[in-house]
From Swiss-Prot:
Its main location: cytoplasm. Homodimer. It is found in: Cytoplasm. GO terms for biological process: chromosome condensation; chromosome segregation; DNA replication; sister chromatid cohesion. Contains large globular domains required for ATP hydrolysis at each terminus and a third globular domain forming a flexible SMC hinge near the middle of the molecule. These domains are separated by coiled-coil structures. This is Chromosome partition protein Smc. Required for chromosome condensation and partitioning. Residues 519-637 form the SMC hinge domain. Keywords: ATP-binding, Coiled coil, Cytoplasm, DNA-binding, Nucleotide-binding. Residues 167-206, 259-481, 672-864, 893-943, 990-1029 form a coiled coil. Disruption phenotype: Mutants produce anucleate cells and show defects in nucleoid structure and in chromosome partitioning. The keyword Cytoplasm applies.
């Protein structure tokens, strides 16, 4: 392959399109300074992929576009096309001619083409990689590059040798692999972060989903058992309710009948009482009749005696009466005449008295001034006298009233005394009955006290047993709960182990089909075990390889892989025992690690496994070290040169090379590695708990039977006690009634004492009052007598007034005397008139009585015999009536006694009926309350079915049948509710959420496995490339070093030169030092040589590289500028010598170089800022040289 042509337009100073055709051999490009000849080199470098504007002697990529001149506008495009002959297929492309084009626009856009086909810059770089023709290759040495090679650091100088060794593609691939590794690690980190986050979700969600499923199962079971039990309870309760309702209905009917009987009895008692009252009233009436009859009989007897006496004096009385009648008639006539006369005289006297009174009034007015005081006193005394006179009359009337009241009080006292005697007898009877009741009550009370003591003792024992039972039952339910939890955990672990939960999908499917596939030993983590404290470290050390599947051989692995592909089950990594070889620490490193205090052991030594799997375990864990902590891991890694992977107990990792991985490790409830151990522990604990639970069940059963026996005994004691209490209540009721009756009688007796006392006190007060009134009457009489004397005294005093009044007084006196006389006469006449009238009236009355007596006497005398007989007959009749009345009273009293006995019987019967009625009513109320509670309970149960399960009783009974004993069912319901309560808050959405998150977790786990495998593969690739680069670099370096000394001697005409590695132990990073000893000088570093010597040494290095690694073409830009003529000549000869194998394009202005050139191109700048290329013939070149 060789360079055929370069086409340029718009690149730097090439404003117009130029084409440079290259031939084999040496092509020289010449021109004055500043003409733009080095732009040819820049154009080639740029089209081969250079991206640094500074390497192209610009500030930014826009600077390579023609910027214009005084006469030309700037261009907006720079384009370079490089055409190469590829007949020998030096370039890895199936074309005989390859053209590479690169364009850049002022807008910043770029275009890349290979054979006019758009491509990427990366494609161009890859095309020339490790061909020696790249942008950084030793085949293109621009201005200053020689000096840069000589003066650069030994490490930077290494790139020339790497290019020569052809390791750039490996280096690039390594870089890509490292980038891919970093990208993979980033992806792995992201996946692990997401997995870490998902692990924080998956495990809780898994637990929540398991709890939710458990909850739904328990809820379903609870629903079935509870509905069936509720339906059973409803049916049982309804049967009891129906029976009780019939009983209550019968009791109501009995109550109604007894109520009617009580009403009838009360009516009979009321009727009897009415009859007794009627008899009492009848006796009272008969006694009144008896009294009247007795009185009439006594009158008749008296009249009989009077008749006998009158009969004796009848004649004598008749004569006397006749004489008296005559006298009375005569007297009547005389009195009538006198009365007529006297009335006329009285009228005359009245007129005179009236006249005298008028005169007296006149005189009194005249005398009033003289005797006013005396008159007033007299008048006052008269007023007092009249008041005393009124008081005297009032006192006499009150004395009469007191006499009447004292008579009435005596009658009342006698009646009260009779009643009191009766009440005393009744109280005596009641006291006897009361004493008997009290004795009976005390006996029952003692018996009740004994029963209560026995009941309390039994109750205490019962409560102790009940507390012990409840305690044991609570412990049993707790044990059930623990057993249930342990069994659930065991089932979960067995299910997870059976389902290979937590394994990658591909691994899981292989393990499930392990028997069918054959040759499958199991996943790595299934084949090992370790102590719990090492589990985290071992899991981290294994990483994804923990789920690698161990097979007998490669054929088994291929069969499993084919199975995964056919069923699209994912991927898995297999470890055939037939090919896996163990790895282990070097003995020296093992000894070094053992001496470190933090070192715990090699991972393979900390796990237990079958010796058959030693190669696999040693391969995976034989070079992994386990330490206490990260600090110790760092120290140990440094001691071992960061060649091994070190894991701490907390899961932190120090990787080979020094990188570190660490942070928080999520604590899993059951890791894959520790699952078997945990299952074994749970199984052991479950067996122990089940044994303890069985013992508790037996204890609870025994206690329950004991409690039931005690409950029966307590019920018997309660029943006996209730019977005694009812009997006691009955006696207490009787005692209460007797106490009430006794209290009533005592009240009557107290009332009698009070009434008697009150009456006695009233009589005594009346007597006192009477004596006082008599004394007052005597005092009033004395006062009246005194007042009369005072009036007489004052009257006499008034008569002894002074002489000035005497005349008037005499006149007045005379007038008064005359008036008094007239008045006295008038009074006398009036009295006479009244006397005559009275006497006339009395005479008329006496005359009438005398006539009547005479008529009666005459009648009696004429019928004395018949009258006496009539009276005798009347007396007999009255006596007969009296006898009948007495007999009738006795009969009524006998009837009353009989009725009273009947009433007492009725009342006792009524009392017993009421007592029994009250008991039945109380029982009926209790039964009704119980019935009401049953109805409420039935309604609650039916409502519970409707509201909780939307079921009717018929639907529940039809769909759900009670399959066990009701008590067992209740126990089961309680256990299920306890289990549900123990589950706490249940997230039912966790089931779907777990499926979603777990699916993603599985997918990402597979991604992690793939990324881990890719990471391991990349590590392996990098390791392989490191080995290849080390080998290639070392081989190439040795060859170049050998040729360098030879070429140096040839160019310098002697001396010697040497290439040295700065770090022979690190061929991947070691720098290269150039040591030169020109002829006649000491061996010394390049920095101590002259400029020419340095340039010639660099040229010697270039030719040494070309000897080892020939390239199709080489571009040299004034590399010999610093050489003298002799060295330029030697340089030109070497160019010519090597031009048979390598095409040289030389940018130069040295004659010796030009002389050896096959073709010359000249670059001129005829127009300011614009370069042009012209071809120069060889003859013209020679002339130009001469």
């Amino acid at each position: 392959m060789f360079l055929k042509r370069l086409d340029v337009i718009g690149f730097k100073s090439f404003a117009e399109r130029i084409s440079v055709d290259f031939v084999k051999g040496v092509t020289a490009v010449v021109g004055p300074n500043g003409s733009g000849k080095s732009n040819i080199t820049d154009a080639i470098r740029w089209v081969l992929g250079e991206q640094s504007a500074r390497s192209l002697r610009g500030g930014k990529m826009e600077d390579i576009i023609f910027a214009g001149s005084d006469s030309r506008k700037r261009l907006n495009l720079a384009e370079v096309t490089l055409t190469l002959d590829n007949d020998d297929h030096f370039l890895p492309i199936d074309f005989h001619e390859v053209s590479v084009t690169r364009r850049v626009y002022r807008s910043g856009e770029s275009e890349f083409l290979i054979n006019n086909q758009p491509c990427r810059l990366k494609d161009i770089i890859d095309l020339f990689m490790d061909s020696g023709l790249g942008k950084e290759a030793f085949s293109i040495i621009s201005q200053g590059k020689v000096e840069e090679i000589l003066s650069s650091k030994a490490e930077d100088r290494r790139s020339i040798f790497e290019e020569a060794a052809g390791v750039l593609k490996y280096k690039t691939r390594k870089k890509k692999a490292e980038n891919k590794l970093f990208e993979t690690q980033d992806n792995l980190n992201r996946v692990e972060d997401i997995l870490h986050e998902l692990e924080g979700q998956v495990e809780p969600l898994k637990i929540q989903a398991s709890i939710a499923k458990d909850y739904l199962e328990k809820k379903k079971e609870l629903e079935h058992v509870e509905i069936a039990l509720t339906a059973y309870d409803i049916e049982e309760l309804h049967g009891k309710w129906s029976t009780l309702k019939e009983k209550v209905q019968m009791a109501k009917e009995e109550e109604l009948a007894e109520s009617s009987a009580i009403s009838a009895k009360e009516a009979k008692i009321e009727d009897t009482r009415d009859k007794i009252q009627a008899l009492d009233e009848s006796v009272d009436e008969l006694q009144q009749v008896l009294l009247v009859t007795s009185e009439e009989l006594e009158k008749l007897e008296g009249r009989k005696e009077v008749l006998k006496e009158r009969k004796k004096n009848a004649v004598q009385n008749q004569e006397q009466l006749e004489e008296a009648i005559v006298q009375f008639q005569q007297k009547e006539t005389v009195l009538k005449e006198e009365l007529s006369k006297q009335e006329a005289v009285f009228e005359t006297l009245q007129a005179e008295v009236k006249q005298l009174r008028a005169q007296v009034k006149e005189k009194q007015q005249a005398l009033s001034l003289h005797n006013e005081n005396v008159e007033e006193k007299i008048e006052q005394l008269k007023s007092d006298y009249f008041e005393l006179l009124n008081s005297q009359a009032s006192i006499r009337n009150e004395l009469q009233l007191l006499d009447d009241q004292m008579s009435q009080s005596a009658v009342t006292l006698q009646r009260l005394a009779d009643n009191n005697e009766k009440h005393l007898q009744e109280r005596h009877d009641i006291s006897a009955r009361k004493a008997a009741c009290e004795t009976e009550f005390a006996r029952i009370e003692q018996e009740i006290h004994s029963q209560v003591g026995a009941y309390r003792d039994m109750q205490t024992k019962y409560e102790q047993k009940k507390r012990q039972y409840e305690k044991n039952e609570s412990a049993l339910y707790q044990a059930y709960q623990y057993v249930q939890q342990a069994r659930s955990k065991k089932d979960m672990l067995e299910t997870m182990q059976g389902d290979f939960s937590g394994f990658y999908q591909g691994v899981k499917e292989v393990l499930k089909a392990k028997e069918r596939l054959g040759g499958i030993r199991g996943a790595v983590l299934e084949l090992i075990s370790t102590e719990q404290k090492y589990e985290t470290a071992i899991e981290i050390a294994l990483g994804a390889s923990a789920q690698h599947v161990v097979t007998d051989d490669e054929q088994s692995a291929r069969k499993a892989i084919q199975y995964l592909k056919q069923n699209s089950f994912g991927r898995a990594t297999f470890l055939p025992l037939s090919v896996i070889r163990d790895r282990q620490l070097q003995s020296r490193d093992a000894e070094t690690a053992a001496r470190h205090s933090s070192f715990l052991g090699v991972a393979s030594e900390l796990v237990t496994f079958d010796p058959a799997y030693r190669s696999v375990i040693q391969n995976l864990l034989g070079t992994v070290l386990i330490t206490e902590d990260l600090k110790g891991a760092n120290e140990l890694a440094k001691l071992l040169g960061h060649r091994y992977r070190i894991v701490t107990l907390e899961g932190d990792v120090v990787n080979p090379g020094g990188s570190m991985t660490g942070g928080a490790v999520k604590k899993k409830n059951n890791s894959l590695l520790g699952r078997s151990r945990e299952l074994e522990d749970v199984t052991k604990r479950l067996a122990e708990m089940e044994e303890k639970t069985a013992l508790l069940e037996q204890e609870v059963k025994t206690l329950k039977h004991s409690i039931q026996d005690m409950e029966k005994k307590l019920a018997d004691l309660r029943e006996t006690g209730e019977g005694l209490r009812l009997k006691q209540q009955d006696v207490k009721g009787q005692l209460y009634e007797l106490q009430v009756a006794e209290k009533n009688i005592n009240t009557h007796l107290e009332l009698y004492d009070q009434e008697k006392s009150a009456l006695s006190e009233s009589d005594e007060e009346r007597k006192v009052r009477k004596r006082k009134l008599e004394e007052e009457l005597s005092a009033v009489s004395e006062k009246m007598k005194q007042l009369e004397e005072d009036i007489d005294r004052l009257t006499k005093q008034k008569q002894t007034q002074s002489s000035t009044k005497e005349s008037l007084s005499n006149e007045l006196t005379e007038l008064k005397i005359a008036a008094a006389k007239k008045e006295q006469a008038c009074k006398g006449e009036e009295d006479n008139l009244a006397r005559l009238k009275k006497e006339l009236t009395e005479t008329e009355l006496a005359l009438k009585e005398a006539k009547e007596d005479l008529s009666f006497l005459t009648s009696e005398m004429s019928s004395s015999t018949s009258g006496e007989e009539k009276l005798e007959e009347a007396a007999k009749h009255k006596l007969n009536d009296k006898t009948k009345t007495i007999e009738l009273i006795a009969l009524r009293r006998d009837q009353r006694i009989k009725l009273q006995h009947g009433l007492d019987t009725y009342e006792r019967e009524l009392k017993e009926m009421k007592r029994l009625y009250k008991q039945k009513t109380t029982l009926l109320k209790d039964e009704e309350v119980k019935l009401g509670r049953m109805e409420v309970e039935l309604d609650n149960l039916l409502q519970y079915l409707r509201e909780e399960y939307s079921l009717s009783f018929e639907g529940a009974k039809e769909k759900y049948q009670l399959e066990t004993d009701p008590e067992e069912a209740r126990k089961r319901v309680k256990l299920i509710k306890l289990a549900i309560e123990e589950l706490g808050t249940v997230n039912l959405g966790s089931i779907d959420e777990f499926e979603r998150v777990n699916e993603r977790y599985k997918f990402l786990s597979e991604q992690k496995e793939d990324l881990t495998e890719a990471k391991n593969t990349l590590f392996q690739v990098i390791e392989e490339m490191d080995e290849e680069m080390t080998k290639r670099f070392n081989d190439t370096f040795v060859q170049i070093r050998s040729h360098f000394d030879q070429v140096f001697r040839s160019l310098f005409g002697g001396g010697r030169a040497e290439l040295r590695l700065t770090d022979p132990n690190d061929l991947l990073h070691s720098g290269v030092e150039i040591i030169a000893q020109p002829p006649g000088k000491k061996l010394q570093n390049l920095n101590l040589l002259s400029g020419g010597e340095r340039a010639l040494t660099a040229i010697a290095l270039l030719f040494s590289i070309l000897k080892v690694r020939p390239v199709p073409f080489c571009v040299l830009d004034e590399v010999e500028a610093a050489l003298d003529e002799a060295n330029v000549f030697r340089f030109a000869q070497y160019l010519k010598k090597y031009s048979s194998d390598t095409q040289f394009i030389v940018i130069t202005h040295r004659k010796g170089t030009m002389e050896e050139a096959d073709v010359l191109y000249g670059v001129t700048m005829q127009e300011s800022g614009v370069s042009k290329v012209i071809s120069v013939k060889l003859e013209e070149t020679k002339e130009f040289v001469q």
